C-alpha cells in the first residue's frame, strides 16, 4: 500500500486552497466569511453547502457531509486518500513527488465499492488499448485516415483518447482475461456481451471509440461510431450499468469543468464530434448529452457549476426543437440564463467548423447569440400563418407572455418595440395588454414551488433529534441549541483544537460519557488519536477517522463559533450541564416507568421507582450531580 510522508501531506494541505479546489465542482458564491453553493452530494434547489477558506473545510447543512479538501475528493471522486492527496497537489500545481501504485488496491473497500473500482479500471485499460490500436496498428489505419480526413488532429485524438475497436469478437475479452479480470464483471460493466452459448465476447467491434467519463473524470462507458458501412446503428453506446447512467452523463463535462468555471458559462451541443471540433476551434466549455434529450439530472449538474448556458444544436428542424426543450428545462426548472446559437439550416457545429473554419465559428459564437426570449419569439412563429388574423393575435399574445417574464423594463421595451414595428401597432396598446400578462406571471411565480428531492438521511441519525432542525439549517437558527448539545459541541471542539484542553477535559469528565452516541464515538477516536502521539490538528484528526459520518461531524464542529477564552471554569460548567441533562433524562424514564406500574397496580415497583425519583430530585436541587 502506497504511503506519503507526513510532511508532504502537510505541505499539500497547507498550500492548497479548498475554495479553489471545490470551485471546480461547485459554483461557489461569497457569503460573509464563507462561500456557499448547491451541494454536490444531494439534490437541492437552495444552497446549503458551505466552504470555509479560513478553516479550509466544507460542510453541507442539508445532508451533513463534511470534511477537508482531501475528504471532499475522496467522497466526490471515489478516490483513496493517497489518490486524493496527489489530485489536490496536481490541481494546485504543487511540485511534490507522489507515486501511485500501478494497480489500485481495492482489498479494503466494501464489495460494492471494490467492484465499482474494478469496473472503472477495466474501462481505463480498455480505452488505452483502443487508442493504441487506432494510432499504432494496421487494423486502426482506416479509422485513423477517416478521422484525419474529417479534420481531426492527432492532438485531439490523444486528448479525447479516441480509439478503435477492431472487428474481432475477443480483442477485449482476451485482453482483460490475461490480466486476471472477471469477465462476468466486465459484462456487467458493459464492455462484453454474453452469447446464447454463454461465451463472453466484445460488445464493440469495427467502430471508432469515444471514451465517456463521469463527472469525476473516470472513464465509465464508451460510444462506438460506424465509419465505413451501414449495417448497424451509427452510434452504439454502452448499456446502463452500475457505473454509467445516460441521464446523469454529459460528454466532456469533467474535462470542460475548468473552462466552464473560468468563463462562467457552458455550451451545450448534440454530438461528440461537435464537442471535439469546438475544442479544437478554441471553445473549451462544450459538452454533449449521450444521444438523449437534456434531462433534469443534466440540468442539475450544470446548475451546480454555472448560471449561464449557450445552446448550440444542429441547425435543422430537429435541432431547433431540441434547443427549445433544453432551454425550457434550464430556464423554468433551474433559472439559468440561456442563449441560443442558431447555425445555418442543415449544419451542425462540426459541419460548420469544417466548412467555414474555426475563426468564423468563434466569431458567430461570440457575436450572434440569441437571448432566450428572442429565440422563443422566433420559435413561436412556427407553423403559424401570420397573415391570418387569428394566428396573428395568438402569436402576439404568446409573445407578450414571454416578454412579461423579463425582469428588466428596458428588455421589455425593446421587444415591445419590435412587435409594434412588425405589426404596425402602438407601444401603448401592447403595454396595456402586457400589464395583464405581468399580473398573471406574478401570480404564477407566487404559486410556483419547487419540491427538493429527499436527501440521504444516513448522517442525520448521528445528530441529536431535538437539535437537527437548527444544526442543519443554512439560515441562522431562530432559537438557541439546547444547553447539553452546546456543551457537547464546545467540549469536543476544544479537545480537537488543543491537546492541553483535551487532557484537562478528559480529567474533568472522568467516567462521565457524552449523552449522544456520535459524540462519545468521536471522543473515543480522539483518545486514540492523541495516544498515538499526534498534535492537536482537526485536519489530521479528520484524515485519521475512517468513517465519513464522523468526518461530517468534525466539519460541523469546526463551523461552530466558540467563546474567545475558555478554561477550566467554562469546561466544568459544560460538564455540569451535560450531567444535569443526563439526570433529567433518567428522571423522565423513571416517571414513565412509574406511570406504567401505577396502571398495573404494581405497588412494590411503584414505591421503588418513587424513591429513585426522590433521590434524583435531591441531586438536581442540590447541584451535586455525580
Curated annotation (Swiss-Prot):
Ranges where the Toprim domain occurs: 264-346
ZnF locations on chain (CHC2-type): 39-63
CDD domains (alphabetical): TOPRIM_DnaG_primases (cd03364)
Organism: Listeria innocua serovar 6a (strain ATCC BAA-680 / CLIP 11262)
Enzyme class (EC, first level): transferase
UniProt domain comment: Contains an N-terminal zinc-binding domain, a central core domain that contains the primase activity, and a C-terminal DnaB-binding domain.
Cofactor(s) the protein requires to work: Zn(2+); Mg(2+)
Native organism taxonomy: Bacteria, Bacillati, Bacillota, Bacilli, Bacillales
Function: RNA polymerase that catalyzes the synthesis of short RNA molecules used as primers for DNA polymerase during DNA replication.
Name of this chain's protein: DNA primase
Gene Ontology cellular-component terms listed: cytoplasm; DNA-directed RNA polymerase complex; primosome complex
Description of how the protein assembles with itself and partners: Monomer. Interacts with DnaB.
Binding positions for Mg(2+) 2 per the UniProt entry: 314, 316
Cofactor binding: number and manner: Binds 1 zinc ion per monomer.
Domain of life where this protein originates: Bacteria
Catalytic activity: ssDNA + n NTP = ssDNA/pppN(pN)n-1 hybrid + (n-1) diphosphate
GO biological process, any: DNA replication, synthesis of primer
Amino acid at each position: 500500500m502506497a504511503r506519503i510522508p507526513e510532511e508532504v501531506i502537510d505541505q499539500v494541505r497547507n498550500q492548497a486552497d479548498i475554495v479553489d479546489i471545490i470551485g471546480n465542482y461547485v459554483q461557489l458564491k461569497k457569503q460573509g466569511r464563507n462561500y456557499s453553493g448547491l451541494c454536490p452530494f444531494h439534490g437541492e434547489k437552495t444552497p446549503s453547502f458551505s466552504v470555509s477558506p479560513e478553516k479550509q473545510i466544507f460542510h453541507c447543512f442539508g445532508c451533513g457531509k463534511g470534511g477537508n479538501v482531501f475528504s471532499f475528493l475522496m467522497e466526490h471522486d471515489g478516490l483513496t486518500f493517497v489518490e486524493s492527496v496527489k489530485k489536490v497537489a496536481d490541481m494546485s500545481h504543487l511540485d511534490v513527488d507522489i507515486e501511485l501504485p500501478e494497480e489500485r488496491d481495492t482489498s479494503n473497500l466494501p464489495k460494492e465499492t471494490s467492484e465499482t473500482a474494478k469496473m472503472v479500471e477495466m474501462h481505463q485499460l480498455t480505452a488505452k488499448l483502443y487508442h493504441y490500436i487506432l494510432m499504432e496498428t494496421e487494423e486502426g489505419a482506416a479509422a485513423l485516415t477517416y478521422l484525419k480526413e474529417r479534420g481531426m488532429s492527432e492532438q485531439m485524438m490523444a486528448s479525447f483518447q479516441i480509439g478503435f475497436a477492431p472487428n474481432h469478437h475477443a480483442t477485449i475479452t482476451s485482453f482483460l482475461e490475461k490480466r486476471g479480470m472477471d469477465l462476468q464483471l466486465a459484462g456487467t460493466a458493459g464492455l462484453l456481451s454474453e452469447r446464447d452459448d454463454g461465451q463472453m465476447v466484445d460488445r464493440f467491434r469495427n467502430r471508432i471509440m469515444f471514451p465517456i467519463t463521469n463527472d469525476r473524470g473516470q472513464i465509465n462507458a464508451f460510444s462506438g461510431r460506424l465509419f465505413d458501412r451501414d449495417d448497424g446503428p451509427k452510434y452504439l453506446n454502452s448499456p446502463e450499468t452500475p457505473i454509467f447512467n445516460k441521464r446523469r452523463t454529459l460528454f466532456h463535462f469533467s474535462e470542460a469543468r475548468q473552462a466552464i468555471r473560468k468563463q462562467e458559462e457552458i455550451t451545450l451541443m448534440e454530438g461528440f464530434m461537435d464537442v471535439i471540433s469546438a475544442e479544437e476551434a478554441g471553445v473549451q466549455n462544450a459538452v454533449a448529452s449521450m444521444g438523449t434529450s437534456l434531462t433534469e439530472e443534466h440540468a442539475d449538474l450544470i446548475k451546480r457549476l454555472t448560471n449561464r448556458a449557450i445552446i448550440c444544436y444542429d441547425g435543422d428542424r430537429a435541432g431547433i426543437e431540441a434547443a427549445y426543450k433544453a432551454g425550457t428545462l434550464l430556464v423554468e426548472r433551474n433559472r439559468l440564463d440561456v442563449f441560443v446559437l442558431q447555425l445555418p439550416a442543415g449544419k451542425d457545429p462540426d459541419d460548420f467548423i469544417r466548412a467555414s473554419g474555426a475563426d468564423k465559428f468563434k466569431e458567430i459564437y461570440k457575436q450572434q447569440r440569441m437571448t432566450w426570449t428572442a429565440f422563443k419569439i422566433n420559435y413561436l412563429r412556427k407553423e403559424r400563418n401570420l397573415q391570418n388574423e387569428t394566428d396573428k393575435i395568438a402569436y402576439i399574445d404568446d409573445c407578450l407572455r414571454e416578454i412579461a417574464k423579463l425582469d428588466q423594463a428596458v428588455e421589455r421595451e425593446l421587444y415591445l418595440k419590435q412587435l409594434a414595428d412588425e405589426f404596425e401597432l402602438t407601444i401603448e396598446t401592447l403595454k396595456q395588454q402586457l400589464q395583464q400578462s405581468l399580473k398573471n406571471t406574478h401570480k404564477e411565480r407566487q404559486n410556483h414551488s419547487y419540491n427538493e428531492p429527499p436527501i440521504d438521511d444516513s448522517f442525520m441519525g448521528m445528530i441529536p433529534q431535538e437539535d437537527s432542525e437548527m444544526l442543519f439549517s443554512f439560515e441562522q437558527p431562530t432559537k438557541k441549541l439546547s444547553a447539553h448539545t452546546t456543551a457537547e459541541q464546545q467540549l469536543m471542539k476544544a479537545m480537537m483544537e488543543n491537546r492541553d484542553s483535551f487532557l484537562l477535559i478528559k480529567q474533568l469528565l472522568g467516567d462521565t460519557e457524552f449523552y449522544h452516541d456520535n459524540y462519545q464515538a468521536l471522543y473515543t477516536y480522539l483518545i486514540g488519536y492523541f495516544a498515538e502521539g499526534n498534535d492537536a490538528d482537526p485536519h489530521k484528526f479528520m484524515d485519521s477517522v475512517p468513517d465519513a459520518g464522523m468526518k461530517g461531524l468534525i466539519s460541523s464542529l469546526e463551523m461552530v463559533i466558540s467563546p474567545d477564552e475558555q478554561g477550566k471554569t467554562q469546561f466544568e460548567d459544560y460538564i455540569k450541564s451535560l450531567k444535569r441533562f443526563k439526570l433529567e433524562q433518567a428522571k423522565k424514564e423513571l416517571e414513565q416507568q412509574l406511570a406504567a406500574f401505577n396502571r398495573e397496580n404494581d405497588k412494590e415497583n411503584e414505591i421503588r421507582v418513587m424513591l429513585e425519583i426522590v433521590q434524583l430530585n435531591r441531586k438536581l436541587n442540590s447541584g451535586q450531580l455525580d
